[in-house]
């Protein structure tokens, strides 16, 4: 038996439920949303395809139905309105989380809490602070999606299977994120060397263009279709699978830091071992001096926001 509760049945929540239903790793999925009819409709829509896949029980519920869930995926939150600043949105969602998280904990304080709502790094830290849950049991989807975008772009550049591209986007899931080029490789061959062997461009301008494309990917998609949800739902599925299967896989999830690269009291993404008990350990990467400074800058930006929150 494996149960996942998804809080928020919007684009991301509903699509995550769909990808998890297809995964075959979950026996029960409950969708919880203030708009109960939306959750009921999404659950029915997914359920009508169950005869064609592995059996899974998908249904709509309330906070009390998170009881017994192995993983609670939080996608609920306010959307940014025209003219609203990022800080306004952060404060609004922090208020929502301060009300919602204690309600969830009433019914389940044993689950892994996976935060997906943006700004994910801030809300992961907010959840960690107000929940009182042990370190590792609360973390965010972080830059798992960004790293996937990065690998995809490099695979297209090199005409290679993206699964053979090993690269990480670290730091904030947002404007200050960056690629850890110093450890990027293709099947063990450094990216620089691989490009040299294959006659591919790998200069400073190319790297800058790739990073900018990763950072701006969501903006581009939102401009075209209004929202992003397919790829992030695949990222959610991958993280949940790592937990339920106790894979101890390495993913760039966002966790509260406790001294990595001189940073603490914020949540940021670094490659981390993820298994049945959540995040087991954050890996210490051999970053370049420039990358360490970029990471610290990302942390500083997050810390400035956190200082303005009432948590």
Curated annotation (Swiss-Prot):
One of its GO terms (cellular component) is cytoplasm. It is found in: Cytoplasm. Keywords: Allosteric enzyme, Cytoplasm, NAD, Oxidoreductase, Phosphoprotein. GO terms for molecular function: L-lactate dehydrogenase activity. It is an enzyme of class 1 (oxidoreductase). Substrate binds at residues 80, 86, 118-121, 146-149, 228. This is L-lactate dehydrogenase.
């Amino acid at each position: 038996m494996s149960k996942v509760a998804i809080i928020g049945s919007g684009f991301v929540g509903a699509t995550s439920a769909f990808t998890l239903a297809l995964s075959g790793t979950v026996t029960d999925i409950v969708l919880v949303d203030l708009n109960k009819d939306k959750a009921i409709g999404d659950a029915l829509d997914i359920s009508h395809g169950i005869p064609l896949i592995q059996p899974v029980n998908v249904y709509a519920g309330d906070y009390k139905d998170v009881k017994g869930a192995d993983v609670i995926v939080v996608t609920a939150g306010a959307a940014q309105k025209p003219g609203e600043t990022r800080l306004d949105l952060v404060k609004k969602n922090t208020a929502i989380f301060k009300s919602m998280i204690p309600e969830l904990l009433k019914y389940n304080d044993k689950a892994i809490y996976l935060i997906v709502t943006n700004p994910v790094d801030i809300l992961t830290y907010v959840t960690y602070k107000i929940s009182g849950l042990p370190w590792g049991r609360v973390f965010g989807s972080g830059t798992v999606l960004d790293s996937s975008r990065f690998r995809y772009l490099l695979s297209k550049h090199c005409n290679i299977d993206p699964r053979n591209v090993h690269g990480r986007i670290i730091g904030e899931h947002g404007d200050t994120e960056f690629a850890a080029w110093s450890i990027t490789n293709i099947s063990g061959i450094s990216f620089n060397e691989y490009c040299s062997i294959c006659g591919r461009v790998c200069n400073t301008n190319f790297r800058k263009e790739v990073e900018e494309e990763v950072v701006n990917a969501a903006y581009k998609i939102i401009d075209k279709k209004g929202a992003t949800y397919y790829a992030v739902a695949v990222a959610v599925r991958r993280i949940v699978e790592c937990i339920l299967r106790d894979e101890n896989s390495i993913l760039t999830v966002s966790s509260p830091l406790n001294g990595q690269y001189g940073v603490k009291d914020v949540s940021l993404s670094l490659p981390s071992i993820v298994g049945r008990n959540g995040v087991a350990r954050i890996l210490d990467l051999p970053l370049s001096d420039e990358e360490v400074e970029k990471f610290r800058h990302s942390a500083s930006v997050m810390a400035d926001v956190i200082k303005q929150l009432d948590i």
